[in-house]
Amino acid sequence: MIRDAEPRDAAELARVHVTSWQTAYRGLINQAFLDAMTIESRIERWDTLLSHVRGRVLVTEADGKVAGFCSVGPADADGWGEVYAIYLAPEHWGVGLGRGLLEAGEKALGENGHGRAQLWVLSTNARARAFYQRQGWTLGRPIRIENIGGSDVTEVRYEKPLTGP
């Protein structure tokens, strides 16, 4: 089941956020930064985020618990929507929940009038890049350098045309 996130989801969103980062980004970003991530600190961030959402945060559930989330909204580029984040708890990788969550995010962007969408992904994250490509996203031209956990990393942009409601 996919639904909009609610304030009561903050702790589960924090758990998914931390465990997915610590697993997916192992070897890709600063390990000390990953090791220092705590669910407690992320709960505070999610409490704040959910009270000031700049778009929509969708969650997917499995066995009555939040299994993943997708955050979407307007991009800085004119008319573009953006998938700000999509993460699944590692125990739910590879079973189709991510595909459904991404499709729901794309649909939400289309319903909000965005004709195309973008997302950013670490250039070294082969698993995520393959996932996006399987979902019809194509590599765009821009790259950017971001500082995550005290280390500079390269991100590439993926793009996809959207259909409306």
Please tell me what each predicted stretch does.
Residues D4-A10, R15-W93, R99-N112, L139-I145, ...:
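Acetyl-CoA-dependent GNAT
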Residues W80, G115-R129, Q133-P165:
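C-terminal "cap" of GNAT-fold acetyltransferases
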